Amino acid sequence: MRAVGLITEYNPFHNGHLHHLRASREAAGAEVAVAVMSGHFLQRGEPALLDKWRRAEMALRCGVDVVVELPFPFACASAPHFARGAVQCLDALGVDSLCFGSESGDLGALQRCAQLLEECGEQVAERTATLLRRGMHYAAARSQVCAELSGCDAATLPLHQPNNILGIEYLRALRATGSAMQPFTISRLGAGYHDDAVGPGNIASASGIRKRLAMGETVDELLPAPAVDVVAGARADRLFPDEDLLHRLLLAQIFRGRDYLQSLYQVESGIDARLTDAAATSRDWQALVDAVKVRQFTRTRIQRTLMYILNDVRGDLMASLLAAGPLYLRLLGSSPRGRAFLGAARKRRRLPMVTNLSRIYSQLKRTYGPRSEDYRLALAMLELDLRATRNYSLLLPGWSGVSRERDFFEAPLDIHSAI
């Protein structure tokens, strides 16, 4: 069974995602669509709109066949680490191809950029850092450097838009890992990431949809019908994360002091002081981010740093986990066709597949050996995923007493597509 891989957040699953899913199957000639999806905290440094099980349910009801979770260290990371972790998960599952959306839609142009960044990586990093110190923003600085090195006009290089940037990192990850997955890209339809407008086919950006939900507006026409029901249920039960709760939890962590903050991942010299100063007076989450942000770091980078603080992510450990790569595959759900694929691909799978967390410790011990470094890192990676679920539950106003150790009680979803 030919399988196409999709790297996703589904925050939430909307009409643009449905287009991407269907176009990816067609482009790759695939019978099965396999999604690796972020868990409770996302690449841009924010909690997901819906918990990972509801988002997996939306995906499966809308036609995805397999959903596996991207572990926290990669889900809430910079684009290169996010891309590499996701590519490694799909490769370990035995997926044949990878199809991603991009503003460019030009695979050749994206591959040329990926090759340039691989071959001239040190030069790009050094020159970009120089421009950042002069006050230029990161995306513009990297585009200018790549234009200078390639001899192209910066405006012709697809390095500004978010999906192009991720696409280039997926291509770099394929090269770096030696993956045999064949890449495809399809053009994004409708609104860009930061655009609140609705495009043809009722396609809006995920951020635009979240803004509408926050303002109490209806979004039914922007989502496939099966996703509408899932979002409506979470909305009625007050299970969207609350920014005020997020802000208060972050303040409690920041008030532990600068020595503590300096032990955490990406809390660099100077940021710890800005954090403690901002925590003393900030009125809400957005004000906290605004007060900490400095020119050389993007807003997204600051938000990710705050998620590391919330989840107590130690610097030395995170560096080791990112270097190791994903050490298990957490199955969130599958369709009948997806289960057939997983069974057929079992012998090709290169990482342990976790379906029951009550048995994961013995499963990891058998796979890696009880005294191995990989076993130690796998347990640490698992603990971060479990911590993310516990902390996410603290952000939900309507949490009703379901165990915060929910990871141990949720079996993989078994769902037929509804469309």
UniProtKB/Swiss-Prot annotation:
GO molecular function, one term: tRNA binding
Protein family according to the UniProt entry: Belongs to the TmcAL family.
Substrates-to-products reaction catalysed: cytidine(34) in elongator tRNA(Met) + acetate + ATP = N(4)-acetylcytidine(34) in elongator tRNA(Met) + AMP + diphosphate
Compartment(s): Cytoplasm
InterPro entries named among the record's database cross-references: Rossmann-like_a/b/a_fold, tRNA(Met)_cyd_acetate_ligase
Name recorded for this polypeptide: tRNA(Met) cytidine acetate ligase
Record function comment: Catalyzes the formation of N(4)-acetylcytidine (ac(4)C) at the wobble position of elongator tRNA(Met), using acetate and ATP as substrates. First activates an acetate ion to form acetyladenylate (Ac-AMP) and then transfers the acetyl group to tRNA to form ac(4)C34.
Pfam families (alphabetical): HIGH_NTase1
EC number: 6.3.4.-
GO cellular component: cytoplasm
Binding site for ATP: 7-20, 101, 163, 188
Keywords assigned by UniProt, alphabetized: ATP-binding, Cytoplasm, Ligase, Nucleotide-binding, RNA-binding, tRNA processing, tRNA-binding
Primary location group: cytoplasm
GO biological process terms on file: tRNA modification
Superkingdom of source: Bacteria
Principal EC category: ligase
